[in-house]
Amino acid sequence: MASRKDTLVRRASRVRRQIKAVANGRPRLSVHRSSKNIYAQIIDDVAGKTIASASTLDTDLRSSLKTGADTEAATAVGKLLAERASKAGIKDVVFDRGAFIYHGRIKALAEAAREGGLNF
C-alpha cells in the first residue's frame, strides 16, 4: 500500500508531466500551500530560473493579513504575484497546482492572479 507522501509525489509528477506537454515555452506558475502559509512563483523551466514570487511571508502582506492560511491571504498573494509578473513582462503562464486539488486557497490564488492580468 502506498503511503500518503508517495501518492502526493505521484500526483504532482503527473500534473507536472501534463503541464510540460502543453506549456509551449510559457513559464509555469507553481503553487504550494502549507497549513500556515501559501507560496507562489513563476518559473522559467527552460532557463531554470524564478521570474517572480510571492507568499504570505512577504513583509508587504504579512502585516495586512490576519492569517496566512485562508482564502483572503491566497487572494492577496495572487494579486501581488500578478503585479510582479507584469513588471517582469509576463502575461501568459501555465498553472501548476502540484499535488493540491483546485479548490479553496489554490482556486482563490488562481482567480486573483487572473484578475491581476495573468492568462492561463
Swiss-Prot record:
This is Large ribosomal subunit protein uL18. Pfam families: Ribosomal_L18p (PF00861). This is one of the proteins that bind and probably mediate the attachment of the 5S RNA into the large ribosomal subunit, where it forms part of the central protuberance. It comes from the Bacteria. The gene is rplR. One of its GO terms (molecular function) is structural constituent of ribosome. Part of the 50S ribosomal subunit; part of the 5S rRNA/L5/L18/L25 subcomplex. Contacts the 5S and 23S rRNAs. Belongs to the universal ribosomal protein uL18 family. Keywords: Ribonucleoprotein, Ribosomal protein, RNA-binding, rRNA-binding. It comes from Rhizobium meliloti (strain 1021) (Ensifer meliloti). The keyword Ribonucleoprotein applies. GO terms for cellular component: cytosolic large ribosomal subunit. InterPro entries: Ribosomal_uL18_bac-type, Ribosomal_uL18_bac/euk. GO terms for biological process: translation.
